[in-house]
Every structure is written in C-alpha cells, then in structure tokens.
C-alpha cells in the first residue's frame, strides 16, 4: 500500500500502533481506547493530507464483503470529526477504499454481522484506489 501511494506521488509516513514499542502495543491491546484504532499511515501530496487505516488482511476474496469492526468505525468517525478536514480512508487488501461515514451509510439498513460487532459492506460499494489517490501513470507524468 505504501509503495502504491508513493507511485502516485504521495509522501507516506507510518503512524499508529505499529510505530509504538512493544510495551505500549501490549497496553493498548488491554484497553478499549480509540487509540487502538489510530490510522496506520499519514500521507501528503502537494497541499493534500490524508490518513489511512490499512485493512490489508481483509481482501474479501470469499464473500465479496468487507467486515469492519464496529469499534473501528466508531473510532474512525471520532477521528474524522476531531481532525477535519483531513480525511480517513480504509484501504483494503484489494486496494479498494471506503471512509468511516460510507461504512455507516452502506450498512444503516443493510447487512450486519449477526453479533452486531461488524459492519458488512459489499466490495462493489468501495472506490477504486486510483479514483481516490490518483493513478501511478499520472504521478509519473507530473
């Protein structure tokens, strides 16, 4: 995902749990804090700034649906509100993209996991990576 963004002219930097020392990650696992859901990447291109929560282990190859935890979506909505106008994007393993608000919109009257712990969104609802972040060819030509 980082390579795909860089190929489109974005400067990318890691953030979130993967950047913390093991003791901090362990402590976060034991809490319900929204910090557990902090975005994985921050990226800039020109004057544009975005944050990305990488969902690369969720390609939805079997069901044609993404399962996004309710905790993740709730934290994403809070993050988006606190850091507006900087968007937060969920980028999935198949490089398709949704925002927290879109997850809520597409699941308000639709498929929900029977436990209520996940929002299930059809992959066809997601945006193509190039539509959100630009194409690699356009970045090379610029």
Where are these regions (language model features)?
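Mg2+/Mn2+-dependent nuclease catalytic core
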Residues: 57-80
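Glycine-rich, highly charged phosphate/nucleotide-binding loops
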Residues: 33-38
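Conserved catalytic cores of phosphodiester-cleaving nucleases, focusing on short active-site segments
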Residues: 39-60
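Short, flexible/disordered intra-domain loops and linkers
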Residues: 23-32, 60-68
């Amino acid at each position: 995902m980082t390579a795909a963004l860089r190929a489109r002219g974005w400067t990318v930097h890691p953030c979130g749990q993967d950047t913390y020392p093991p003791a901090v990650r362990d402590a976060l696992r034991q809490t319900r804090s929204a910090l557990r859901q902090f975005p994985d990447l921050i990226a800039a291109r020109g004057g544009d700034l975005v944050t990305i929560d990488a969902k690369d282990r969720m390609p939805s190859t079997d069901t044609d649906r993404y399962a996004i935890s309710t905790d993740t979506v709730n934290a994403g909505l809070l993050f988006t509100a606190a850091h507006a106008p900087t968007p937060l994007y969920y980028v999935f393993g198949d490089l398709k993209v949704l925002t927290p608000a879109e997850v809520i919109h597409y699941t308000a009257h639709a498929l929900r996991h029977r436990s209520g712990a996940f929002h299930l969104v059809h992959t066809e609802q997601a945006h193509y990576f190039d539509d959100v972040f630009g194409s690699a060819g356009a970045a090379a030509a610029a």
